[in-house]
Structures are given as structure tokens and as C-alpha cells.
Amino acid sequence: MLVDLDQPGETAAWLGGTAISIKADIARNEGWAHVAEEVDRTFGRADIVVNNAGIYPRALIDDLDFDLWRKTLAVNLDAHFLSAKHFVPRMRKNSWGRFVNISSNAIGMSVDGLSHYMASKMGVIGFVRGLANDVGPYGITVNAILPAITNTPGTRGVSDEDKKAFWQLQAIKRLAEPEDIVGPVAFLTSDDAQFMTGQAVVVDGGLYKVS
């Protein structure tokens, strides 16, 4: 089930496949309550949650007001907490569950105008590690993926020049595509990764290795 605030149907079509899409605000508790109800009604159980929503508004500290700070943390971090509040109890009933939370390799970089974004994505790592301890006894794993900047609708606002500045630092000299991230996500949701939890998996074309 694909959840989006704006046009989930368009995103589902862009991704392809047979995804069911619903509209909800994942930065609010009410949004996740709606998602959980729809999952119960449609599937009868919840096994896997991938927290992939995020915003990337750039602003230097002089231009960064509290509203933008809070909006960034609400979408990029609060949503991960809310997903756990609604779906951990459902997964616990089945003694099995997988959370994959998307952070960013930007947390290890120095980039102007992204202090709020980096704070939110670093927070994801801390939350993943803490939650993994809480839910591990119930057969639930929690991991994070730190991707490079990726060619998705969410990065359309990033200039080609800025994108190139990132990927030129990588060992693999190109922009990441969604397909590059799908494989690691699928692995972390599988039984093959049942002994991995609380981990931050970097999928960034080798940027950390060479910088």
C-alpha cells in the first residue's frame, strides 16, 4: 500500500506494478490512524513498513524559521515514530515485522542550508537503533538505509548542477535511481535479514568510501 499526501495514484503509476494507493498526511497521528485502518481492512495484517516520505527544503539559518524546521522534522522524523506507534502492536500479534526507515547519506556531509534536514535524518538513525531494542524480542526488525541523492519526484527541486556535485564525489559516477535502492530495501524486509536490526546501511555509490 502506497501512502502519499498529494497524488498517491500518480506516484503508484510512476512506480509501476499493482500498488494500492491512499491519501494521508503521514506527519500527523490522524494520517497514520487512517493508514492502519485501511491496512486492516484491505490485508487483515501488517508485516512491513517502509518509511520513505521526506522533504528537502534548503535554507540557511538566517532564513530558516521555526515553521520550516518543524515541518521538516514532522515529515522526515515524526512520521517514523507515528508509524511505529500504529504498526508495532499489529506486528507484535504476529511475532514478525519489518521496518525500513530511509535516512540519508547527507548526515555525513557538509552541505549549506540543510541543518534542519540533517537533524531530521540523523534523528532517524537514533530512532531506528532505539526502537530495534524495544521490538527485537517480538520478531520485529528495524533498520535504516542511507541513500545517495536519488532520481525521484522528490528531488525535482534540486538543480542538475547540485545533483552532479554530489554524484561526482561517488565511486560510481552517476545519479542513483530508485532501482538502486529497491534491492537493499527488499533484502532488509526478507527472512534473509532476520538477524540484522538497528543497522544503518549506506547505499550511496561509494561516496563514504572515497571522500
Please place each PLM-identified region on the residue numbering.
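Short-chain dehydrogenase/reductase
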Residues: 1-43, 57, 68
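Substrate-binding pocket helix/loop in short-chain dehydrogenase/reductase
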Residues: 60-61, 68-73, 155, 166
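Active-site helix of classical SDR
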Residues: 84, 120, 128
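Short C-terminal tail/terminal secondary-structure segment
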Residues: 109, 186, 197-211
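Short, small/polar-rich loop/turn modules that mediate ligand/substrate recognition or access, typified
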Residues: 136, 141, 196-198
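A conserved structural motif in NAD(P)-dependent oxidoreductases
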Residues: 170-181, 192
